[in-house]
A protein has these predicted regions:
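Sec-dependent signal peptide recognition
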Residues: 2-8
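Hydrophobic h-region of N-terminal signal peptides that target proteins for export
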Residues: 10-18
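N-terminal active-site segment of His-dependent metallophosphoesterases
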Residues: 19-90
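Beta-strand-turn-beta hairpins that frame and shape the catalytic cleft
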Residues: 25-34, 144-159
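Active-site environment of divalent metal-dependent phosphoester hydrolases
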Residues: 43-45, 80-83, 104-115, 165-168
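Metal-dependent catalytic neighborhoods of phosphoester/phosphodiester hydrolases
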Residues: 76-93, 112-127
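Active-site neighborhood of divalent metal-dependent phosphoester bond hydrolases
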Residues: 100, 106-137, 155, 162
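Conserved small/polar residues in nucleotide/adenosyl-binding loops
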Residues: 192-197
Length: 197
């Protein structure tokens, strides 16, 4: 009975996430505009860093208002200071205020603060415009976003996390895409709106 209840809860949660995910589509002019913010390094830890963070947030707002993107993508090292939860909410605020769909791919420094990857995942997926879903261990899952054309899917945007650091003791340095991720990317799939790994 526990397995059936767990399965039903998982299916309901997945369906709920699918229902809330905004649809992405090319405009009538044939364009799809993406604003990408990478290596934001938002840090609210000291008065100086908070002042710098406010300049960053103001610049993000300016870009979003000037460009009117169809999608916002955050890639790597978004928050690199404590208190990380406050910084995550602050960096996502300009996107949420504009009701823009967005996706986050973590960098190697995001989980070095006072939040785990799962805690970051819960914050990111708490926003209505997120296209992220939670995967193994509650972390942000790899996703492929379908961008619709007038009659059929016109483009796919893959968002994969290469993780933090090497998981092999004899190899130093940063992480990489796993064989499982590469296999997921290569696998032929029937796409609906978005697929999580």
């Amino acid at each position: 009975m526990k397995k059936i209840t767990t399965l039903m809860c998982a299916v309901a949660l997945w369906c709920s996430a699918q229902a809330q995910a905004p649809a992405l589509h090319f405009g009538r002019d044939g364009k799809f505009r993406i604003a990408q913010f990478t290596d934001v390094h938002l840090d609210l830890g000291t008065p100086y860093r908070r002042a710098q963070a406010e300049k960053t947030i103001a610049q993000m707002r300016y870009i979003l208002d000037a460009e009117h993107p169809d999608l916002v993508v955050f890639t790597g090292d978004v928050v690199t200071g404590k208190p990380a939860a406050q910084a995550w909410h602050r960096v996502l605020e300009p996107v949420a205020e504009r009701n823009l769909p967005f996706c986050v791919v973590l960098g190697n420094h995001d989980a070095e603060q006072d939040l785990t990857r799962a805690e970051i995942g819960r914050i990111v997926t708490s926003y209505a415009g997120t296209l992220n879903t939670l995967g193994a261990g509650g972390e942000l899952a790899d996703v492929v976003l379908e961008i619709a054309g007038t009659k059929k899917p016109a483009a796919l945007l893959y968002c994969l996390d290469s993780h933090d650091y090497s998981t092999i003791p004899s190899i130093d340095g940063y992480g990489w895409f796993t064989q499982e991720q590469v296999g997921w990317y290569r696998a032929p799939v029937s796409y609906t709106h978005l697929r999580a790994h």
